Amino acid sequence: MKKSDPAPGGEEKVDRIVRQVWDLTEPVIRAEGMEIIEIEYRRESPGWVLRVFVDQEGGVSVDDCARISRVVGDLLDVADIIHYPYHLEVSSPGLNRPLRKREQFAKVVGKVIEVKTLVPFGTRRNFKGILKEVGVERIRMDCDNQLFEIPFSNMDRARLRYFDSQED
């Protein structure tokens, strides 16, 4: 395997592993009063890392992350989804958190976000601006005094830009 390969079996296998981990762990994490914000699975020095980002109303503590890590680790050991060595990390999504669900966008209306689209608007795929509105199927954001409506179905990824949202 070349070092640049995303995983044994390629990027599709990484996506499949992420989906399986999400499906396996979401009910248990939800039962703990938390939600999964994002799951990453990638090769880093010295090996593979599985990161599960969780959040709850009021934020998550180090103790919360340790508890969820034990639960997720036990589930993954039993399910045997990943067949080679990896390191599990459970943490808060941080200030510049990813945005995936409509509800997550609704919480940050008026803040600065970044969106990368799957299909370009003209020649543009990257947008950074103030989130103005969240609809059922799309968001509206102001990028340098120009309004863009971006459907959720065209979003590759989106992220809150916490420090860009703070006033001087």
Swiss-Prot record:
UniProt-listed CDD domains: YlxS_C
Gene Ontology annotations of biological process type: ribosomal small subunit assembly; translation
Keywords (A to Z) from UniProt: Cytoplasm, Ribosome biogenesis
Residues that span the membrane, as ranges: none
InterPro entries attached to this UniProt entry: Ribosome_maturation_RimP, RimP_C, RimP_C_sf, RimP_N, RimP_N_sf
One Gene Ontology CC term in the entry: cytosol
Cytoplasm as UniProt keyword: yes
SUPFAM superfamilies the UniProt entry points to: YhbC-like, C-terminal domain, YhbC-like, N-terminal domain
Subcellular location per the Swiss-Prot or TrEMBL entry: Cytoplasm
Family: Belongs to the RimP family.
Chain's role: Required for maturation of 30S ribosomal subunits.
Protein name: Ribosome maturation factor RimP
